[in-house]
Amino acid sequence: SGGMSTAIDELSNSYFHPLQHRSPEFATSVGLPGADQGTFSDYSPAGIAEDAELISSTLAQLDELTPVNDDDAISADALRERLGLQLELFEAGEITGEINVIASPIQEIRDIFDLMPTDTAEDWHTIARRLTSVATALDGYKESLLARVASGPAIPKRQVLRCAEQCDTLKDSASSSFHKLAETGAAVFPELADDLREGALDAQSAYGELAAFLRDEISPHATDKDAVGHERYQRFSRLFLGAAVDLDE
């Protein structure tokens, strides 16, 4: 907002600043220097509830502020739209134990490694640390899946089984992106080879355990219906399109 930082700018910063620590993946995806990228968010119900609490208090503070000019009003609207939707999804039970074959924690935890810097030994040391953190992240996620089974919304069985297949791919060294990543680093920094390979094996076995967990613990409680339903679809289309869509057109 033209050089001068407004109260709304400050609030926005006060939300995003702790986010880089609460969500190391966020720090990685926006390339924030100085944030620790060797770990993961807390994917458990408690961790997700804390995130929602931060969003909720930020929105409450936003309601107390008056934009000083047009730019400021645009900033406020953008923040309110983004955070309001996140909160709505959380309250509808959509964030806890989210599972699908494209953009759920199963893929996010895997894909974040593609965005990590790989130039220095320090970078690879961070990658090794994050590989050993995969199991903890997936344990939190399993708790959330069980919470979702207990309180809904229903989980489509087809998604569960296809996600289990994705986990199988990540488990086996022949196909695992974790294995390839470790070997790439080991070739450049032999002194980190042991840490990287150990981290990769940890991550692979964590995904192997998740595959079994999905088949044994979650699939029996999942629904054969894949339908999303009008209200849920509207929320998700807003999430991806950034606007409310008139679905009845």
Residue ranges and their predicted role:
Residues 2-249:
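N-terminal maturation segment of proteins
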